[in-house]
Amino acid sequence: HTALGSPDDLEQLGFALGADVPSQIRPGRVLAPGAGEQLERVPGVARYGAFLERGVVVMPGYVNIGAWVGAGTMVDTWATVGSCAQIGRNVHLSGGVGIGGVLEPSTATPVIIEDGAFIGSRAVIVEGVQVGEEAVIGANVVLTASTHIIDVTGAQEVVHKGRVPPRSVVIPGSRAKKFPAGEYQVPCALIIGQRSATTDSKTSLNQVLRDFAVPV
């Protein structure tokens, strides 16, 4: 085994550990006796002024001032909850998710993620967009106040802006738009199905992800 405890070891690890972390880090590497006293734990960060209900799990992510996060919610690795954003209960923010914040003007609307929603990895939701209860947002979806959120499940498309309806399953898409230089594809979001409201939430979510092959 290689003992850790010097500054060089910290550079190799890329992060620091606290004294209460189990001594085994990875096969072949263990902390030297007393080394934990020299190291500092780096957990997720909730800034002073944020409110997290009991039972919130924050991986190495960040919750900014004024944000509200409900019980049972997971803020996964490198996910960011912006200032004054409102995250409901039992929400899952996957790795790298960006939830936009707003401090001013005071009349601006914060991003709201309602209870039970699932936000896939690297999704970005900003400018006061609201995600309805138990909606599923696929990986890499970008939602702004002006993003066209197009329901393509019926014979005619239905366009939403600023709000994802409850239990909607959303993936990235594009639509044609004419410019002086020609016609180009611009980003949009597509509602491709509905998460069942009549079955257990967890079972329903897993089935939706399979049925629609939604990347998360």
Where are each of the predicted segments found?
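Terminal amphipathic alpha-helical/low-complexity segments used for targeting or macromolecular assembly
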Residues: 40, 161, 167-168, 172-216
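Structural signal for interior beta-strand "rungs" in well-ordered beta-sheet cores
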Residues: 46-178, 191
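Generic secondary-structure transition motif, activating predominantly at the C-termini of alpha-helices
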Residues: 15-18, 29, 60, 195, ...
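Solvent-exposed, flexible loop/coil residues
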Residues: 25, 29, 35, 43, ...
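Residue-identity detector for glutamine
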Residues: 12, 24, 37-38, 86, ...
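Flexible, glycine/proline-enriched loop segments at strand-loop-helix junctions
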Residues: 1-2, 78
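ATP-dependent small-molecule kinase catalytic core of the GHMP/sugar-kinase superfamily
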Residues: 2-45
